């Protein structure tokens, strides 16, 4: 089985390769002393060229001490790699009960299908291309070997939208004439499978994916539905779904430029009041959502010790591909970058704000781990290195923003006991 060296090596980890490299050296004769070190050349460019050896090893692209990259050349490869990372399906470890298959040209269905990633359904998302299943997807599907369960009502493959499924799997089709209709049908399907109504519903733009992408990670984390609205109106399937989900708390992700107050007023005419989250900057929009919480809704990531996922806002289907990383492992929200080379200032500030720290013992500290989605043409190795540095555990000093109080600069003496006052016979004190 071949699923793409870059994608799978990044997803499955590098430990096995390192082990074999070390093991192979055991029987080798002792090497000759190395030749004199070459002359050091200082490069004046911002980025130094990577040595050939580093390129062959795959580091630091595949992983650094605080990051792991899913290095797929496109969203199809990213989805296959993430699915196999979350469900290794080897060594006696079972695969998922079901898988969702989504058209690679339909980012809206991918975001909406993320609610099926959440337990107990736990269906990772794979991508197809209309009437043809890509070899990466077919190989991943074979390795995952979904077997159905009571939680999926025996379904092994959820066919989302207009895609041709591979043969031999128990399939349930979710179809519709528009992204809004498909999203509403996915909402109904999850309710049927879990026999529960959602407590919360997340409304996103069906036309501006850079604001909608973070919804996929929350849907995977919570199982709550994602429904689509237009800028100034609400599609009929969304209205019908909101009426069915009567009583749920409603949240809208994105600025008024993506979802206007007029559209939200139309929602409120048939359902509950809507709370808006987000910002006109897509990077800050995702950060605001990662920080947000209201009751049981929201990530509330405002301190160190968490997983995070970073994708490019130019690759909306990577949000769906990466969704299983938000429903297992270190359960992280999706953040986005609009620059492939440099960490955006808003993202840099957020990572510094939740940067982990320690007072005296780093082994007792909490850590942040960050998944990078896409190959280095999507997100550069330089940006990955910057993220790794921002996530690094650091000794706590005053003003580090790690939410850990630094130790006092000098040992504090206990307060001296005040001298006792002479007592009168009646037990009172003298004036």
Which residues does each predicted region cover?
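Extracellular glycan-binding segments that recognize GlcNAc-based cell-wall polysaccharides
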Residues: 3-8, 15-22, 30-431
């Amino acid at each position: 089985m071949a699923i793409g060296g870059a994608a799978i090596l990044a997803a499955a980890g590098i430990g096995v390769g390192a082990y074999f490299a070390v093991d192979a050296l055991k029987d080798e004769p002792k090497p000759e002393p190395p030749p004199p070190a070459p002359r050091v050349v200082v490069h004046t460019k911002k980025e130094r060229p990577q040595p050939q050896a580093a390129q062959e090893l795959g580091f630091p692209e595949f992983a650094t001490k605080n990051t792991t990259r899913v290095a797929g050349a496109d969203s199809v490869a990213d989805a296959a790699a993430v699915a196999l990372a979350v469900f290794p399906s080897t060594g006696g470890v079972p695969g998922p009960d079901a898988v969702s298959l989504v058209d690679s040209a339909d980012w809206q269905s991918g975001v909406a299908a993320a609610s099926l990633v959440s337990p107990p359904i736990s269906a990772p998302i794979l991508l197809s291309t209309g009437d043809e299943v890509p070899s990466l997807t077919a190989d991943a599907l074979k390795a995952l070997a979904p077997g159905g369960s009571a939680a999926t009502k025996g379904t092994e493959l959820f066919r989302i939208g207009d895609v041709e499924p591979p043969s031999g799997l128990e399939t349930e089709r979710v179809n519709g004439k528009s992204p809004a209709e498909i999203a509403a049908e996915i909402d109904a399907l999850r309710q049927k499978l879990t026999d529960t109504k959602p407590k919360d519903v997340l409304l996103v733009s069906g036309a501006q994916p850079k604001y909608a992408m973070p919804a996929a990670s929350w849907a995977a984390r919570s199982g709550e539905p994602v429904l689509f609205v237009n800028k100034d109106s609400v599609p009929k399937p969304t209205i019908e779904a909101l009426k069915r989900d009567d009583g749920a708390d409603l949240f809208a992700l994105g600025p008024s430029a993506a979802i206007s107050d007029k559209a939200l007023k139309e929602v409120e005419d048939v359902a509950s009041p809507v709370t808006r989250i987000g910002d006109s900057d897509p990077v800050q929009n995702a950060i605001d959502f990662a920080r947000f919480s209201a009751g049981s809704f929201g990530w509330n990531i405002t301190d160190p010790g968490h997983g995070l996922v970073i994708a490019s806002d130019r690759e909306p289907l990577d949000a769906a591909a990466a969704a299983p990383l938000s429903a297992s492992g270190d359960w992280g929200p999706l953040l986005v970058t609009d620059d492939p080379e440099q960490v955006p200032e808003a993202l840099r500030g957020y990572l510094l704000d939740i940067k982990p720290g320690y007072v005296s013992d780093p082994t007792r500290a909490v850590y942040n781990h960050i998944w990078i989605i896409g190959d280095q043409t999507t997100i550069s190795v330089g940006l990955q290195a910057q993220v790794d540095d921002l996530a690094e555990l650091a000794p706590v000093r005053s003003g580090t923003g790690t939410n850990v109080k630094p130790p006092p600069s000098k040992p504090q003496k206990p307060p001296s006991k005040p001298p006792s006052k002479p007592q009168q016979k009646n037990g009172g004190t003298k004036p």
